[in-house]
C-alpha cells in the first residue's frame, strides 16, 4: 500500500465527490465479470489524484489470484509495487487512492471490509472503496458505489473498544459507520460521441418488452440472504441479552452477600466480637467481560442494505404491474 498523503490540497481528508473515468469503470466491470462470475470475491487497486475535495480515479489494476499455499501478503505487496513502478515509468497516475471489490447481492458489510478500509484511510486519509455488484447490474441498474469510514468510526476503531457505552457516547449507529460518497462517471468528448453513435445504430427493442415483469429469482435470493442475516442478528442480540442477565444476576448476588455480611457483623458486635475482616469483592465477583457490539452494527447495516434492495426491486415490479393492469383494463 502506498504510504503518505497523495495531495496537499485537502488537509482535512474531506472528500465530497468521487469522479471515475469511464475506462476505469469498464476495467472494474470486466475484472469482476471474468473473475467473479462464480460468486468469488475479486479486489483491485484504485489509482488517481486529489483535487481540492474531489477524488479523481483515473486507473486501476486487479489483485492477483493467490493459490493455496502462496505467501499472499508478500506476493500482493511485491505485485502492487511492481505495477506502480511500471506505471510511474510511463508517466501514468500511480498514486494509491483506494481499492475496489465485487459483491454478491450486496453482501459486503463485514469485518474484512472494515479492517481493510481502516488500514487504507489510516495510511491515505482520502482513500475510498468502490463496491460493484454484477448481479444487480445485470438487472439493468449499474451498481457502483463509493464508501469510506466516518471520522467517528475511525476514532472508535483506533480505540478498539465497541461496547454499548462507547458507541452511545460516540453517537455511532449502523447508519453512521460508513459514509457514501456521491460518484460520477466522466467520459472524454470522443467517448461521448461514440456512445451517441452506438445508441443510434443499436436496434430498438420491441415495444412490448418494457412491461415485462422481472423474474422472482432475484427477489427470492435477496429474501433468503435477508433471512440469514436476521437470524445471525437475533443470535447476536440473544448473546448480549444473556450478558445483561448475567450482570444483573451477579449484582444481585453481590448485594445479597453484602447484606448477609452486614447482618453478621451486627450480630458479632452485639456478642462483643470483632467484625469480619474486609474482603476484596472484586476477586469474589469478577467483572464480566463486556461483549463487543461491532458484529451487531455490521449485521444491522447488512440487513438494512438487503431491505433497501427488496424495496427498490418491489417498487419497480409493482409499478410495471399496475401499469400493465391499467392498459389491460383499457384494452378490454
From Swiss-Prot:
Pfam families registered for this protein in UniProt: eIF3h_C, JAB
Residue stretches making up the MPN domain: 18-153
Listed GO MF terms: metallopeptidase activity; translation initiation factor activity
Top-level lineage group: Eukaryota
Cellular localisation: Cytoplasm
SMART domains: JAB_MPN (SM00232)
The keyword NAD is assigned to this record: no
Single GO BP term: translational initiation
Region (Disordered) location: 251-285
This protein's UniProt keywords: Cytoplasm, Initiation factor, Protein biosynthesis
GO cellular component terms listed in the entry, alphabetical order: eukaryotic 43S preinitiation complex; eukaryotic 48S preinitiation complex; eukaryotic translation initiation factor 3 complex
UniProt KW Cytoplasm keyword: yes
UniProt xrefs under PANTHER family: EUKARYOTIC TRANSLATION INITIATION FACTOR 3 -RELATED
Record note on quaternary structure: Component of the eukaryotic translation initiation factor 3 (eIF-3) complex.
Family: Belongs to the eIF-3 subunit H family.
Purpose: Component of the eukaryotic translation initiation factor 3 (eIF-3) complex, which is involved in protein synthesis of a specialized repertoire of mRNAs and, together with other initiation factors, stimulates binding of mRNA and methionyl-tRNAi to the 40S ribosome. The eIF-3 complex specifically targets and initiates translation of a subset of mRNAs involved in cell proliferation.
Protein name as annotated: Eukaryotic translation initiation factor 3 subunit H
Organism of origin: Nematostella vectensis
Lineage: Eukaryota, Metazoa, Cnidaria, Anthozoa, Hexacorallia
Amino acid at each position: 500500500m502506498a504510504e503518505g498523503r497523495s495531495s496537499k490540497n485537502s488537509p482535512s481528508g474531506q472528500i465530497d465527490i468521487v469522479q471515475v473515468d469511464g475506462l476505469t469503470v469498464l476495467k472494474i466491470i470486466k475484472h469482476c465479470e471474468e473473475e467473479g462470475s462464480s460468486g468469488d470475491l475479486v479486489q483491485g487497486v484504485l489509482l488517481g489524484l486529489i483535487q481540492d475535495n474531489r477524488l479523481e480515479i483515473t486507473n486501476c489494476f486487479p489483485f492477483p489470484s493467490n493459490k493455496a499455499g502462496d505467501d499472499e501478503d508478500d506476493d500482493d505487496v511485491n505485485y502492487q509495487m511492481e505495477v506502480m513502478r511500471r506505471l510511474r515509468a510511463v508517466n501514468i497516475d500511480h498514486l494509491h487512492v483506494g481499492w475496489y471489490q465485487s459483491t454478491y447481492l450486496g453482501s459486503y458489510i463485514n469485518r474484512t471490509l472494515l479492517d481493510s478500509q481502516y488500514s487504507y484511510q489510516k495510511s491515505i486519509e482520502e482513500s475510498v472503496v468502490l463496491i460493484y455488484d454484477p448481479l444487480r447490474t445485470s438487472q439493468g441498474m449499474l451498481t457502483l458505489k463509493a464508501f469510506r469510514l466516518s471520522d467517528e468510526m475511525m476514532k472508535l476503531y483506533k480505540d478498539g473498544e465497541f461496547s454499548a457505552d462507547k458507541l452511545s457516547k460516540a453517537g455511532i449507529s449502523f447508519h453512521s459507520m460508513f459514509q457514501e460518497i456521491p460518484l460520477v462517471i466522466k467520459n472524454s468528448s470522443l467517448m461521448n460521441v461514440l456512445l451517441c453513435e452506438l445508441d443510434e445504430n443499436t436496434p430498438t427493442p420491441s415495444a412490448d418488452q418494457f412491461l415485462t415483469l422481472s423474474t422472482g429469482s432475484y427477489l427470492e435470493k435477496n429474501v433468503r440472504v435477508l433471512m440469514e442475516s436476521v437470524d445471525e442478528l437475533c443470535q447476536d442480540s440473544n448473546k448480549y441479552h444473556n450478558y445483561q442477565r448475567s450482570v444483573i444476576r451477579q449484582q444481585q448476588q453481590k448485594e445479597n452477600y453484602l447484606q448477609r455480611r452486614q447482618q453478621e457483623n451486627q450480630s458479632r458486635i452485639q456478642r462483643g466480637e470483632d467484625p469480619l475482616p474486609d474482603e476484596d469483592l472484586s476477586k469474589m465477583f469478577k467483572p464480566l467481560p463486556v461483549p463487543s457490539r461491532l458484529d451487531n452494527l455490521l449485521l444491522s447495516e447488512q440487513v438494512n442494505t438487503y431491505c433497501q434492495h427488496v424495496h427498490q426491486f418491489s417498487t419497480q415490479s409493482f409499478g410495471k404491474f399496475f401499469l400493465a393492469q391499467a392498459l389491460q383494463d383499457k384494452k378490454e
